[in-house]
Amino acid sequence: MTQLLLPIIYLAFISLGLPDSLLGSAWPTMYPQLGIPFSYAGILSMIISLGTIVSSLNSDRLTRALGTGRVTALSVGMTAAALFGFSVSGQFWMLCLWAVPYGLGAGSVDAALNNYVALHYESRHMSWLHCMWGVGTTIGPVVMGAALSGGLSWNSGYRYIALFQIALSAVLFCSLPLWRKRPDAAPDGTVPKALTLPQVFALPGAKEVMLCFFCYCALETTAGLWASSYLTLVRQVPAQTAASFASLFYIGITVGRGVCGFLTLKLSDDQMIRLGFAVLGVGIAALLLPGTQVFALAGLVLVGLGCAPIYPSVIHATPAHFGVQHSQAVIGIQMSSAYVGNLAMPPLFGVLANNITPALFPFYLLVFLVLMALMHRQLVRKTAHA
């Protein structure tokens, strides 16, 4: 059953990434056709993020009641419906309505699948599965670009991705008997407990892992959003070169996770996390070096490579840190804190850059790296004695 389920889970992780990059790639075409301000993309992004936060916080109870297979199939079906809704929408308010199931579906499947893989598969699969998420985020804009360059509308790009999600949802529903044969209980037979939020927060190390995830996602999203502007405005890198290296940041994360899958054969999750911190530190230091642009460009790629092992390794270590009976609940709050970091921290840097200077970019990343490293150290210490 393990070998039969694994390809389905890989496909599910690709499907998680497909919608994540669609809005950004389609928005330059969408907003003039809809007759709305450019900034309204932030409203849609906020609605989607709030939906993912809500569903992540409730993923523990949902997964306990329905099982990982049903939650995954229903959630992918929900996102498929939302994407199809986007494809037939001609007004902004319609997009806002469809953004609600879009976010709710994404949060539930993210938390449920991550916990299932952490319980049942080796660390290398967690790295490779998150690499597949990166593949999905790469395919999404390619599909949208192909639709637009072929003379079709942005609605068609969303429709193509929706059809893929609908097909995957059908595969997931057909695979439900496989999930039943591989129950959500851990290999030792331990059944996860449903916990209230106060009970989760009271677990030793829970606050630390939440802050660790918050800082990681704040750093990753801020770097991805503002790196090109920093290179252009502060380091005088030509705009085209800066844009290319900004894309290499995400390629670095995706390729890095593929490589990290092999490194996990020799290194533990906590060692992989510390390795990521070290590479991140070198990358941020390179961004700070004055003079030649080469250091800044290389630093950005290193920041992407440093990010690669952290997210999947923190998730995979959750059952070891908190116990398999608590892992689903803890991963749910990890996901929600990650989305809060994604939602709040990149705009905050925009305010700082606008009112002070964009040269604060590497220092802003450094604050999150230091805090993340401190929280991880506290997490390991507290859970070792729990």
Task: Give the positions of each predicted feature.
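Cytoplasmic helix-loop-helix junction between adjacent transmembrane helices
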Residues: 98-132
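Helix-to-loop junctions at the C-terminal end of transmembrane segments
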Residues: 55-67, 256-269, 353-354
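Helix-breaking motifs and short loop linkers at transmembrane-helix boundaries and internal kinks
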Residues: 35, 67, 88-93, 236, ...
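Extracytoplasmic gate region of multi-pass secondary transporters
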Residues: 23-24, 204-247, 251-254
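Interfacial helix-cap and linker-helix signal at transmembrane-aqueous boundaries
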Residues: 30-31, 62-63, 143-152, 231-232, ...
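A late C-terminal transmembrane helix in Major Facilitator Superfamily
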Residues: 321-358
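Conserved MFS/SLC helix-loop-helix module at the cytosolic interface between two early adjacent transmembrane helices
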Residues: 54-93
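Helix-loop-helix hairpin linking two adjacent transmembrane segments in secondary transporters
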Residues: 129-180
